Amino acid sequence: MSTLDSPSLEVRWDGPRATLLVDGAESSCIDTSDPTYLDFEYMQHATCALQATFPSSAPLRVLHLGGAACALPWAWSLLFPSSRHTVVEISPKIASFARETFDLPRSPILKIRIGEARAVIDSLRGSSFDVIVRDAFAGESL
């Protein structure tokens, strides 16, 4: 049994590819040799939609509700070099584990805010984002 402050975290490595399991559920997959490679199909689809909508030079402001190992914001920060990403992660343990384990970009490229998504969104009133990604899971469901 886990709590939001103390989930069970495990990384399974397959060569340069790392899959983060949170409480036994696959949560993120990062290819450390090519962070633009996205293993999860829904992330591939979201990336196709973003690339079809915006030029790679677009200075996008993206809000990610949920982050885990931050595979999607890391990939997008490389595919859209002028983009800035704010990740809202409910678990401080997951956020610090991701920062310690992976070579994630630092602020201002990729900021990680700890908190419950609704509360953080309320604190961001007056801010604007070009894209908002809902990527928060509880167990194996959204």
Which residues fall in each region the model found?
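Rossmann-like AdoMet
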Residues: 1-54, 78
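The AdoMet/dcAdoMet-binding core of the Class I SAM-like
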Residues: 37-142
